[in-house]
Amino acid sequence: MKSSVCVLLKVLACILLPGGLNAQKESNDDIQHYTADDCQVTPVIHVLQYPGCVPKPIPSFACIGRCASYIQVSGSKIWQMERSCMCCQESGEREASVSLFCPKAKNGEKKFKKVSTKAPLECMCRPCTGIEDANVIPQELAAFADDGSLAGYFQKSQFKAAE
């Protein structure tokens, strides 16, 4: 179950946080936010495939987890938003060579094919790819009403938590 955790900044902002109640609260003078970083190297079974060869399951590793992200109104330019998008990614990788049995090899070709595979060495929360400004809808187009007060700039979320 995903839950939304809303916090009061100098202005109101809402952060979708998949960590729910397991999130840890951090704060400084200007902002309160929640982190739920849990990015780890996890053992998996990876099936290596190559045309004409028998698929071979091998033990491997993957980066699995979640990282804290947020969006908030800029402290210096209230008409702009500040974003921090963090993703669970590899930091270093290992490489291995594995032999696959290829029973359908043509005459003159080897029955075993050596293939290379990679796996993460370590995992950490790192910045995701950036959001292009062209994909951000201005507040005026997103139906935010300007009634002269700060409260008029914010509407209740249209999103419902998944159950």
UniProtKB/Swiss-Prot annotation:
Function: Final heterodimeric neurohormone released at the end of the molting cycle, involved in the sclerotization (tanning) of the insect cuticle, melanization and wing spreading.
Disulfide bonds: 39-88, 53-102, 63-123, 67-125, 85-128
InterPro entries on file: Cys_knot_C (IPR006207), Cystine-knot_cytokine (IPR029034), DAN (IPR004133)
Subunit structure: Heterodimer of burs and pburs.
Main location group: secreted
Annotated protein name in UniProt: Bursicon
Source organism: Aedes aegypti (Yellowfever mosquito)
CTCK domain segment(s): 39-129
GO terms assigned for molecular function: BMP binding; hormone activity
A Pfam family assignment: DAN
Superkingdom assignment: Eukaryota
Keywords linked to the UniProt accession: Disulfide bond, Hormone, Secreted, Signal
Signal peptide: 1-23
GO-annotated cellular components: extracellular region; extracellular space
Gene that encodes it: burs124
Compartments where found: Secreted
Note: The bursicon gene is encoded by two loci: burs124 contains exons 1, 2 and 4, and burs3 contains exon 3. Exon 3 is trans-spliced into position in the mature transcript. This unusual gene arrangement has existed for at least the 150 million years (MY) of mosquito evolution since the split of the culicid and anophelid family lineages, but is younger than the 250 MY split of the dipteran suborders Nematocera and Brachycera (containing the Culicidea and Drosophilidae, respectively).
GO BP, sorted A to Z: animal organ morphogenesis; chitin-based cuticle sclerotization; cuticle pigmentation; sequestering of BMP from receptor via BMP binding
PANTHER family: BURSICON, GREMLIN 1
